[in-house]
Each structure stands twice: as structure tokens, then as C-alpha cells.
A protein has these predicted regions:
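Rossmann-fold dinucleotide-binding core
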Residues: 82-151, 159
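Rossmann-fold NAD(P) dinucleotide-binding segment
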Residues: 45-105
Length: 246
């Protein structure tokens, strides 16, 4: 469910081995999703998901939006369908309760770009059945991913460790008047990271990064908030810490 980078990347990955239906909120979003995912049926009516065995929600990282979506899914899907969310920052237990079927609910936290990133963090409410856990572990295997079960805690493992590091890089930029390229090059060549922290923030999206930071209790740097106010959200907006051209 969704038409963003995570939803479309997951749909492309799954379409190699599964019949895939992509739900989009509007006709415009559906057209965009159709351009990004060739081997999938794109729909705008939730009822069209009724025949799906597993539905993975990848809408905006907003608690109210996600709770409402899971409530609606719980009403239209058959009782044996598994509902999963791509969140890592919101309470899995609360979203599961909103769906009305916590026994058939789990978190399937994939990473962008989905086609290249091997890890999936799996998290479940206490009420999740062993069958549900097994089905999502098996789905990860069929997608060519490594599923690791983690506690239902804000940020899970990766984001809880990652975002304080990313924000520390921004504070270094603010405090020491060092160029973004210098920080990123140091971390790529010195620590072996494939991407520097500031380029990674641009890739994630500064608005998304701020939302995740707030949800896990990390102190979001003022520089990030200023860039968001300026509309410099990162790569998707053409500018963030860096300038981008198509």
C-alpha cells in the first residue's frame, strides 16, 4: 500500500515471484506508481485488496494516518489475511490493535533502495500467532531478504543506532564550519561506509528523517528543521545538504 519509494521498491521486488497489487491514494498517485512498477496491478479502491494473502502498508510515517489505514484494512480484508506495516518508529502493538487482528499483524521494515538492501527487520505484537510470524519470515526468504526479529521499540535496531549518528554529523557541520563533502568523504574512506551521513540524510528525505528522529526521541538538529522550512527536503526535492540535478 502506497506509491512512494519504499512501496514501489517492495512491489518491484515482490513482482518477480508473486502476483502484486499496488494501492494508491489517488489517480495521480496511481499513475505515478504504474510508471514505477510495471508488473503490478495498480488500484485506488481498498476493496480491490480483498484477494491478497499479505498486505504491506507503506504510507506516510504518521501515527494517525497509519492507524486509520489499518482500521480500514481490518474491515475490508478477509480474517486470514496478514497485515504488515513498514514502520520502524511507531508502536507495532498500537497499529496491530487498530487493525482489529493483532494475531495476524507484524512489522516488515525494509530499507531503501529495497531491491539492493538485504535486511528486513521483523517485529510483532505479543498477540501475533506463530503462523503469522512464520509467514512473514517465509515472505522475506522468498524476496531474497534476511529477516531478523527485533523488539517492538522505537527505531527497532537500525534506526535507533543510525539517526543519532546522522544528527551528530549535522551538529558537527553546524559547530565546526566543515563542508558536507569533507564529513561524508571521511566516513566513506575512513569507516568504510558506502554513503556519508549527510548524503544519506538527503537520500532518506529530511522531513522523513526529522519525523523518525522525533519518534525515537533523538534531538533533531536546527539545521535540519531550517532546510525543511526552505523546502530543501533532500534528493527528492532537488536540494538538501547538496544540490541535485535530474
Amino acid at each position: 500500500m502506497g506509491s512512494g519509494a519504499i512501496a514501489c521498491g517492495l512491489a518491484r521486488t515482490a513482482s518477480d515471484h508473486h502476483e502484486v497489487v499496488v494501492w494508491a491514494r489517488s489517480e495521480r498517485s496511481a499513475e505515478r506508481a504504474g510508471d514505477r512498477v510495471e508488473d503490478a496491478r495498480v488500484v485506488t479502491d481498498l476493496a480491490d485488496l480483498n484477494g491478497c494473502d499479505v498486505v504491506v502498508e507503506a504510507v506516510a510515517e504518521d501515527a494517525e494516518v497509519k492507524r486509520d489505514m489499518h482500521r480500514r484494512l481490518g474491515e475490508v480484508l478477509p480474517p486470514d489475511a496478514v497485515i504488515a506495516t513498514t514502520t520502524s518508529s511507531l508502536s507495532v502493538a498500537e497499529l496491530a490493535d487498530a487493525s482489529g487482528r493483532p494475531q495476524r499483524f507484524g512489522a516488515l521494515h525494509v530499507f531503501n533502495p529495497v531491491e539492493k538492501m538485504e535486511l528486513v527487520e521483523l517485529s510483532f505484537p505479543d498477540a501475533a500467532s506463530e503462523g503469522t510470524r512464520s509467514e512473514l519470515r517465509e515472505l522475506c526468504r522468498r524476496l531474497g531478504k534476511t529477516g531478523i526479529e527485533v523488539p517492538d521499540a522505537p527505531g527497532f535496531v537500525v534506526n535507533r543506532l543510525l539517526f543519532p549518528y546522522l544528527f551528530d554529523a549535522v551538529r558537527m557541520l553546524e559547530r565546526d564550519s566543515i563542508e558536507p563533502e569533507a564529513i561524508d568523504t571521511c566516513m566513506k574512506l575512513g569507516a568504510g561506509h558506502p554513503m556519508g551521513p549527510l548524503a544519506l540524510l538527503d537520500f532518506i528525505g529530511l522531513d522523513v528523517a526529522a519525523a523518525i528522529g522525533e519518534s525515537i526521541g533523538a534531538d533533531v538538529p536546527e539545521r535540519v528543521r531550517e532546510l525543511i522550512e526552505q523546502g530543501r527536503l533532500g534528493r527528492k526535492a532537488g536540494a538538501g545538504f547538496y544540490e541535485y540535478r535530474d
